[in-house]
Regions:
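Juxtamembrane cytosolic interface motif at the C-terminal end of transmembrane helices
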Residues: 234-238
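Proteolytic cleavage junctions
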Residues: 1-11, 107-233
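Proteolytic processing hotspots in large secreted/extracellular or virion-associated proteins
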Residues: 9-151
Length: 238
């Protein structure tokens, strides 16, 4: 339990006596193959580079419980090169995704339910991180489609998708931080949300069959005329 006057520190979940990264790091280094170490972030958001490096290449999973139904999962063998100290803070809802124009979001979401999400860190992680976010139990069984906003193209790009579990939770894979939109749908959406919205449009039938038919008919007439000429010539000879 946090005492008055103490600085806020993360701690190993279910063992609040082990708090602070200087204590947590040795626990990660000593973890056995297949172990999962869950850290309650306790209001903090930044994880030092040396802590992430402590599980690099190992069969160890670090879970960061951010609170409010949000948690990060980092698998040691997925770490290629930690970029540095990383701020894993996540903003969801109305205060998130402010760099994404409303018309860009609407063009992809249409009538679908959606939620904006912003990561505090800017740039590549140097590893794959899986975020668990709650999309409400009413959406259980549906798919949460993650779209990244590309500021250069000013478009939303499909990143990944996950099926929402009975409790409303879904796991989504991230490799870098930015502004995102999560779109709930009955299926996994394509990498072009705009194209998906046009699925019901009628596509004009090709005119190939019509032109081919005319070509075939013209050939038939030529053959018939040729046969008639041959019969006339043969009749004249005999």
């Amino acid at each position: 339990m946090q005492r008055k006057g103490d600085s806020i520190k993360p701690y190993i979940k279910d063992d609040s006596g082990k708090e602070g990264w200087d204590v947590i790091k040795p626990q990660l280094e000593e973890a056995k193959a297949g172990d999962t170490v869950t850290v309650a972030m306790n209001g903090t958001t930044v994880v030092p580079k040396d802590v992430i490096d402590s599980i690099k290449g190992k069969d160890t999973t670090l879970v960061l419980d951010m609170g409010n139904g949000l948690s990060w999962k980092i698998y040691g063998k997925d770490i290629t090169d930690a970029a540095g100290d990383i701020d894993f803070d996540v903003t969801v809802g109305a205060d998130a995704g402010k760099s994404i124009p409303v018309d860009v979001i609407n063009n992809v979401t249409g009538e679908r339910s959606s939620m904006n999400l912003t990561l505090a860190y800017d740039g590549e992680f140097g590893f794959t991180a899986t975020l668990t976010v709650n999309m409400e139990s009413k959406n259980a069984g549906l798919y949460a489609n993650l779209f990244y906003y590309n500021e250069q193209t000013e478009e939303l790009e499909f990143i990944s998708a996950g099926q929402i579990d009975p409790d409303g939770n879904v796991e989504l894979v991230f490799t870098h931080a930015s502004d995102y939109t999560i779109v709930v749908d009955t299926k996994i959406m394509s990498d072009n949300g705009q194209a998906d919205n046009k699925a019901d449009e009628t596509i004009p039938a090709s005119k190939t069959d019509d032109s081919t038919s005319k070509y075939t008919w013209n050939n038939t007439i030529i053959i018939i005329i040729g046969i008639c000429i041959m019969l006339i010539v043969i009749g004249a000879i005999f």
